[in-house]
Curated annotation (Swiss-Prot):
GO molecular function, one term: ATP binding
Locus of motif 'HIGH' region: 127-137
NCBIfam families: argS (TIGR00456)
Similarity comment: Belongs to the class-I aminoacyl-tRNA synthetase family.
Protein's recorded name: Arginine--tRNA ligase
Compartment(s): Cytoplasm
Annotated EC: 6.1.1.19
SMART domains xref list: Arg_tRNA_synt_N, DALR_1
Length: 584
């Protein structure tokens, strides 16, 4: 709604400025209209900077403002304040329009078309099959899932992709440890999820390697056997990968993370080699004296000199590929399959240099333009005791974290719910809300120190707090339904409380927040918005009697406002992959 009003004002102001420029014989290349919220609400709802136009048109601000007011008409209340023109909306009409729009559009409220028809691929998660998902993976997963939903809400045609890394030396490490220490155990025999069992052997290998100098040679021998297709080795590889992937998929299901396409690296890693050989034929890369195929990539420098380059190997002298080569094959595969306009990689900040190089080479080899590829880098998730290290077992496993948080809430939940299954479901939903919100609320590029107690807080900027406000509003609406008050046309003119107006303005900005989150590729924008709305409603609820059986008209209006708040909060929760609960 606010977007529509701003667009209307922009069109009318632009028209006025163009007409004035024509009269002044001034040519304008671009009209930049700056709108913002006034510092105080009593000054208006929007403030428009006029001073810049005064300089360009060589006219006083009062003359320009007078002409703009003529163009705007009586639809808005206007007031000149120095270099600004302040706009006040017609509150009665605005409140009615917003509440009706939200309650009619329901889950579609906030959806827009700024990315209409844009084909977007987003690759995220991309786990290794040598360990279970940990809290760092959870941050990757929730960023990818949430951003996908935000991009879809803005009209994008989004395809979610997961590339599972199921080959290489790190996989061979678990295979070697299983051969030495496994004793033919299985997930069923060990009473463990497959990914957790595999993770145990990854840790065992690293313990073994500390005291055995030949461990690395054993890994290389095992890798060679796998590459040669040795039957026994491939059979073991398939078995362990199957256990790991089944376990990882269970965690995806638990956390409500989904993908449109899952690739296995073992099935596509050879494609990149052909791309390099074709590039060599076309003269896009070159062969070094030792037989390695290389390309020159620019070196970042602060010197004011000609661009410097360094050599980058794409195929080793023995014909084997590097990770970058395999990634080039992945880009081509997806370009052919989906013909994307943009591909986003959600990968940690430690890979920034890799992706800069990858995107440059992909462009030079003619696979796709560099600006069609995006590395959405995110900060690491650290523990109070320091950085996580999977090889040492120093991690918070995703499954264990969810279980731990669920158990922490069960004592309180059991006081309110006698049914064991209901209690467990509520506890799980609270823990997921806590984790997803906590991992999204910090700006993506920043590192996080995960704090379990803070994530579970019901009184602060947290997922459980948002869930609680949603459940509280649902309780209000249930009480309203029980009263069965005589229904009639709702009189929204009764909503004259300043807190009500503040809430309405926040609701009306929802679409703008989604657009900004999509353009910035930043789900934390929606997190901050959801907290702002929930906090505003909580303050309103504390100070205001929403249901008053002695005043049915006002009750109808206030409960309809509450419905609009709840719907908007639910829409936020969907974008953030936070479970909504009617009761907590």
């Amino acid at each position: 709604m606010i977007s529509k009003i701003k667009k209307d004002l922009e069109n009318k102001i632009s028209k006025t400025i163009k007409e004035l420029a024509l009269k002044q014989n001034i040519t304008l290349d671009k009209i930049n209209i700056i709108m913002k919220k006034p510092p105080k609400s009593e000054l208006g709802d929007l403030s428009i900077l006029i001073f810049e136009f005064s300089k360009i048109l060589k006219l006083s601000t009062s003359v320009i403002i007078e002409e703009i007011i003529k163009q705007i008409g009586k639809k808005y209340t206007t007031k000149s304040m120095g270099a600004y023109l302040n706009i006040k909306f017609n509150r009665k009409e605005y409140i009615k329009d917003i509440i009706k729009k939200v309650n009619e559009q329901k889950e579609k409220y906030g959806i827009n078309n700024v990315l209409k028809n844009k084909r977007i691929i987003i690759e995220f998660s991309s786990p290794n099959t040598n360990k279970p998902l940990h809290v760092g993976h959870l941050r990757n997963d929730i960023i990818g899932e949430s951003l996908s939903r935000i991009l879809k809400a803005s009209g994008g045609q989004v395809t979610k992709i997961n590339l599972i890394n199921d080959r290489g030396t790190h996989i061979c490490k678990t295979m070697l440890a299983y051969k030495k220490f496994g004793n033919n155990t299985t997930p069923e025999l060990s009473l463990k999820k497959g990914d957790h069992l595999i993770g145990d052997f990854y840790v065992k290998y690293n313990e073994y390697a500390k005291n055995n100098k030949m461990a690395e040679d054993e890994i290389q021998q095992l890798l060679c056997k796998w590459e040669e297709g040795d039957e026994e080795t491939v059979k073991l590889w398939k078995k362990l990968n199957k256990w790991a992937i089944e376990g990882i998929k269970e965690t995806y299901k638990l956390t409500n993370i989904t993908f449109d396409k899952i690739y296995l690296e073992s099935e596509i890693f050879k494609i990149g080699r052909e791309i390099i050989l074709q590039g060599l034929e076309k003269g896009l890369c070159y062969k070094r004296e030792d037989g390695a195929i290389c390309i020159n990539i620019p070196i970042e420098t602060n010197e004011m000199t000609d661009q410097k380059f360094k050599q980058k190997v794409l195929l080793r002298a023995n014909g084997t590929s590097i990770y970058l080569t395999q990634d080039l094959g992945n880009i081509l595969t997806r370009k052919n399959e989906f013909d994307f306009d943009e591909m986003i990689y959600v990968v940690g900040s430690e890979q920034i240099h890799h992706f800069k190089t990858l995107f440059y080479v992909a462009d030079k080899l003619g696979i796709t333009k560099e600006n069609n590829l995006v590395h959405l880098s995110y900060g690491m998730v650290n523990l109070p005791t320091g950085k996580m290290k999977s090889r040492e077992g120093h991690v918070i496993d995703a499954d264990n974290l969810i279980h731990d948080l669920s158990e922490s809430t069960m004592i309180e939940i059991k006081k309110r719910h006698s049914n064991e299954q209901d209690s467990k479901k509520i506890a799980l939903n609270i823990s997921l809300g806590a984790i997803h919100y906590y991992l999204l609320k910090t700006a993506i590029h920043k590192d996080i120190l995960f704090n379990k107690e803070e994530s579970l807080s019901f009184t602060g900027n947290s997922g459980p707090y948002i869930q609680y406000v949603g459940a509280r509003i649902n309780s209000i609406l249930d009480k309203y339904d029980e009263l069965n008050l005589p229904s009639k046309n709702i009189n929204f003119d009764l909503l004259i409380n300043e807190n009500e107006w503040a809430i309405i303005k926040i609701i009306s900005e929802f679409e703008e927040y989604i657009i900004k989150a999509a353009k910035d590729r930043n789900p934390s924008i929606i997190v901050n918005y959801s907290y702002l709305l929930a906090k505003s409603f909580s303050a309103y609820y504390q100070d205001t009697k929403i249901i008053d059986k002695d005043n049915p008209e006002l009750t109808h209006a206030r409960t309809d406002l509450s419905k609009a708040v709840l719907q908007t909060i639910k829409n936020c929760m969907h974008l953030l992959n936070i479970p909504y609960m009617k009761k907590m």
